[in-house]
Structure formats: structure tokens, C-alpha cells
Regions:
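A membrane-topology feature that recognizes alpha-helical transmembrane segments
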Residues: 1-153
Length: 153
């Protein structure tokens, strides 16, 4: 596997996110101290990536900063807003905020014969993909609850 150092370090946080998801399901609590190191690491990796794009000489350099802006200035505040409005739990919002800092763009991993991710999205903002998938899932659950209420099932 070939990847940039920041993208490899981003893989290292997956067990922490998995543990937090498991703990959220089992105990319904994830300590707030869980998210501080993730956001700190994400900020360092973001600076590392940004330094490589500061020249704005490659076509993707400006796009990188647009994607980071969408992740940090749109996705993270929406996660916070959903939490304040009761649409997300605290751990859900903090996880999405941490993801918006850790993974503002899709990481790329090169293997022998193929590259991940396989599908290239139009927007290219990983945290936006996580947010939209979450909203679709919650919308489906709400719609199912509505149907059960209407039909008495």
C-alpha cells in the first residue's frame, strides 16, 4: 500500500472511532476526552496537507482548500446545530466534528492494481458524505416510525 503519511496516520484513528461507536451503542456514553486527541491530530494533519497545497500551482490545490472549507465551515457547524436541536446525540455530533477535521477530503490509498476509494465523488468532501448518509438513515428511521404510528403496526 502506498499513501501519504497523513493518510496513513488517519487510518490509525479508525480503531478509536470503532470503539466510540461500540461504546455509544452499548453504554450510550462516549467520554468527551475521546474527541480531543482526534481533533488535535486532525488539525496537525490538516496543516501538514495544507502546506503541500499552499503554492496553488497544481489544479487540485485550490480545490483542496474549498473542500476543507466546506468540511470545517459547513459540516462541523451543521453537526453542532443538529446536536443542539436534538437531532444528534452529543457523541454523534462530536464524532462528526472530529471527522470533519480529520478527514476533510477523501484519503487515497494505492494498492497493487487498484486504488481506494474506488468511487470518486463530485464534491470530494468525506465528512459531507458521512453527514448525508447519517441524515438519510435518520430520515428513514423517522419515516418508519411515522408509518408505524399511522398504521398501528
Amino acid at each position: 500500500m502506498v499513501a501519504s503519511v497523513p493518510d496513513i496516520l488517519r487510518l490509525a484513528v479508525l480503531p478509536v472511532l470503532g470503539w466510540a461507536a461500540w461504546r455509544d451503542v452499548e453504554v450510550r456514553r462516549v467520554p468527551s476526552r475521546t474527541w480531543y486527541p482526534l481533533v488535535g491530530l486532525g488539525a496537525l494533519l490538516l496543516v501538514w496537507d495544507a502546506v503541500g497545497h499552499l503554492s496553488l500551482s497544481a489544479p487540485g490545490d485550490a480545490l483542496f482548500f474549498v473542500r476543507v472549507g466546506i468540511s470545517l465551515l459547513l459540516v462541523a457547524p451543521i453537526a453542532y446545530l443538529f446536536w443542539r436541536l436534538g437531532g444528534f446525540g452529543g457523541a454523534d455530533a462530536k464524532a462528526l466534528i472530529a471527522i470533519s477535521v480529520l478527514l476533510p477530503t477523501f484519503p487515497t490509498y494505492y494498492f497493487a492494481g487498484f486504488t481506494l476509494p474506488v468511487v470518486v465523488t463530485t464534491l470530494g468532501v468525506f465528512s459531507m458524505t458521512v453527514l448525508t448518509n447519517t441524515v438519510v438513515a435518520e430520515g428513514t428511521i423517522a419515516y418508519d416510525a411515522y408509518l408505524r404510528d399511522e398504521t398501528g403496526a
